[in-house]
Amino acid sequence: MRYFGTDGIRGVVNEFLTPELAFRLGNAVGNMVNGKVFIAKDTRNSGDMLEAALIAGITSAGADVYRCGIMPTPALALITKLEDAAGIMISASHNPPEYNGLKVIMKGYKLPDSLEERIENEMQNVKYNSFEKVGRVIDYRLAEEEYFNYIKELYKNLDLSGIKIVMDVANGATFNLNPKILEYFGAKIEVVNNEPDGFNINKDCGSTHPENIKNYIVNGKIGILHDGDGDRCIFLDENGQEFHGDKIIGLTALQLKKEGRLKNDKVVVTILSNMGLERFLNENSIDVVRTKVGDRYVLEEMLKENITLGGERSGHIIYLDRSTTGDGLITALETLSAMVNSGKRLADLSNLIPDYPQVMLNVKVSDKEVYKSKEVFEKLKSIKDYRVIVRPSGTEPVVRVLVEGPDMDESTIIANDIADLIKKFDNKKE
């Protein structure tokens, strides 16, 4: 059976994602590694249950568990790299609180398809170790400190004094750590959505709901928004306008090029990134490579082509000379560093990077394959002068429709027509 999606194992808790599934995953990983497995989680109420099941699975296989508590996914990735070990992050990232997920990390990196398939096969056949070899559970109190120290050393010359930031931590895994780190660098921080109760993670907040903190953006403040597990980051500029992942990539690509960090003068983006970003980068002698949607595909291309910077419009951005995965805090610090070095406001920098109007619709369906119908294909063929992408979500029962072009009204009409067509054929299948 296929358990892994585009970003680990993810689903509604106690429907698809059960304690038994978590136990089987833990047992499979525990049998594959020597020694220890690090575990961290976000703030969802189901995290404790899934953590307990994972621990039982891992220790029954004879491996030790190092429990890191609540911390962002990129922090766990760093720990596994420093410790040359495996890790499992309990999080569904930007998804609603009824979802959770299990992301397996090996020595800093997410798994390739071949290793996921091997784990899935192992999950079918639970293997217990003898009683004298049952693993232990260690509360790893140094995890947060290790990550903090790593960030402090990376950006030891960064001074954010005088910068006023409203920080939306999405009631998620960054609620405690990330504001402290930005304050360390001198920024004045106002934190919102930082009272996690297990049920409010990502709920009308965080990087998927930037409009909800616009009222806080006054008197020269800028906004920083994370998702539930802290691997994404977007900004609001001083005018309350979204400074999304495409803008961040454009701004920081120029900064990395000046610093001699942009290997091969190339950047990796996905098919969802705006044509305006590509033209801006090309005008600055930077080539653009496009991949399928998903940070794993971005990372694969970066490693294959020896590229330092890659990411998604959603704010999932990888600085490979800084981290092995998308890191919302590093993305924030790279963006703030570029802003400080430019001597300009974020709003002024935003105007330099063009952004063609985009319309994105999420069409709920019972069958995600419906988008492949002949009628939808013919409709897409008939559209001229607009970029259209129709694709199924890897984590939710929806088909995503993206239309991009010179006129917002026309893009909206096209997107709605396609969405209606998908709904029509989905209803016929029910």
From Swiss-Prot:
InterPro entries: A-D-PHexomutase_a/b/a-I, A-D-PHexomutase_a/b/a-I/II/III, A-D-PHexomutase_a/b/a-II, A-D-PHexomutase_a/b/a-III, A-D-PHexomutase_C, A-D-PHexomutase_C_sf, A-D-PHexomutase_CS, Alpha-D-phosphohexomutase_SF. Mg(2+) binds at S93, D227, D229, D231. Pfam families: PGM_PMM_I, PGM_PMM_II, PGM_PMM_III, PGM_PMM_IV. Activated by phosphorylation. One of its GO terms (cellular component) is cytosol. SUPFAM superfamilies: Phosphoglucomutase, C-terminal domain (SSF55957), Phosphoglucomutase, first 3 domains (SSF53738). It is an enzyme of class 5 (isomerase). Catalyzes the conversion of glucosamine-6-phosphate to glucosamine-1-phosphate. This is Phosphoglucosamine mutase. The lineage of its organism: Bacteria, Thermotogati, Thermotogota, Thermotogae, Thermotogales. The gene is glmM.
